[in-house]
Amino acid sequence: MTAIIERRESANLWGRFCDWITSTENRLYIGWFGVLMIPTLLTATSVFIIAFIAAPPVDIDGIREPVSGSLLYGNNIISGAIIPTSAAIGLHFYPIWEAASVDEWLYNGGPYELIVLHFLLGVACYMGREWELSFRLGMRPWIAVAYSAPVAAATAVFLIYPIGQGSFSDGMPLGISGTFNFMIVFQAEHNILMHPFHMLGVAGVFGGSLFSAMHGSLVTSSLIRETTENQSANAGYKFGQEEETYNIVAAHGYFGRLIFQYASFNNSRSLHFFLAAWPVAGIWFTALGISTMALNLNGFNFNQSVVDSQGRVINTWADIINRANLGMEVMHERNAHNFPLDLAAVESISIGG
């Protein structure tokens, strides 16, 4: 009898826990995805803060020349970063217990792998949590679909690209200057500015910013007049009021006269779908571009493609970009390679008689 009562209380406790986890009445919705999201993001954030402040230098290139990234080792907020895991580790799973000591784990950049893997799992769970809350409220799933774009971008630079290149040392450093360094090296090695998917991503991000600014300014400019012509149109309104204050028909008419009729939307749902879909599609393409360049399917190469009747090269802008790429590649990993790979791969020219 006692065992039956204990089992019933245990089942009742589990049921109450499930109800609390999935309740939409909580101030912050947790959900089953949140059960995994909370510990993974807390772990990633905690280790990031500690490592950014105090992590020792990391042998990123695997050549016994450690690179300092933390504040206590001479960096500031701009130059500081979590240095990627050493090339000596490659793509191996490298938790603390795989190293001979904590000092060795830190020297080989173990915190980077720990942070990145927990972070990616956490943001994926955040996306799942968005879908879960939408489902429980009877909403459609497009919020999670929109969030999949930055999740795909983060996964591309932190996981797909290192896998394609064969080492976590090729992942993006976790810091401001580290991000810019990653971008410069990426351009040098993959000519990303000449990749059509990157161009679509730029159009998505900048176009999305433009459309958001246009939409916001139109909405805040087209008031439903509640006053006479002798009074200010702003009279009678207060900031943050619940009642609708703008007229989409008026905004549509204004924009149609400013550009042309069919450049504007007269349907609010179509307009907001477009505002969401444009940047999301662009960022999806960028993530896809990073993933293809991970396998060295690089941007267009028009180097030395224009020649005169004598076969002499007429330099174009593509050749200028190529020269800049070689210069950036020379600066990158200057102690690990004598020459950029582009030069080292070319057979030496015999100058003997």
Swiss-Prot record:
Residue stretches spanning the membrane: 29-46, 118-133, 142-156, 197-218, 274-288
Keyword GTP-binding assigned: no
Enzyme class: oxidoreductase
Binding site for Fe cation: H215, H272
Record Gene3D superfamilies: Photosystem II protein D1-like
InterPro entries cross-referenced by the UniProt entry: D1/D2 (IPR055266), Photo_II_D1/D2_sf (IPR036854), Photo_RC_L/M (IPR000484), Photo_RC_L/M_CS (IPR055265), PSII_D1 (IPR005867)
Binding site for a quinone: H215, S264, F265
EC id: 1.10.3.9
Xref: PROSITE patterns: REACTION_CENTER (PS00244)
Residues holding pheophytin a: Y126
One of the record's GO molecular function terms: oxidoreductase activity, acting on diphenols and related substances as donors, oxygen as acceptor
Chain residues that bind [CaMn4O5] cluster: D170, E189, H332, E333, D342, A344
Residues with site note (Cleavage): A344, A345
Annotated localization: Plastid, Chloroplast thylakoid membrane
Processing and modification events after translation: Tyr-161 forms a radical intermediate that is referred to as redox-active TyrZ, YZ or Y-Z. C-terminally processed by CTPA; processing is essential to allow assembly of the oxygen-evolving complex and thus photosynthetic growth.
Task performed by this protein: Photosystem II (PSII) is a light-driven water:plastoquinone oxidoreductase that uses light energy to abstract electrons from H(2)O, generating O(2) and a proton gradient subsequently used for ATP formation. It consists of a core antenna complex that captures photons, and an electron transfer chain that converts photonic excitation into a charge separation. The D1/D2 (PsbA/PsbD) reaction center heterodimer binds P680, the primary electron donor of PSII as well as several subsequent electron acceptors.
Family classification: Belongs to the reaction center PufL/M/PsbA/D family.
Name under which the protein is recorded: Photosystem II protein D1
Organism: Picea abies
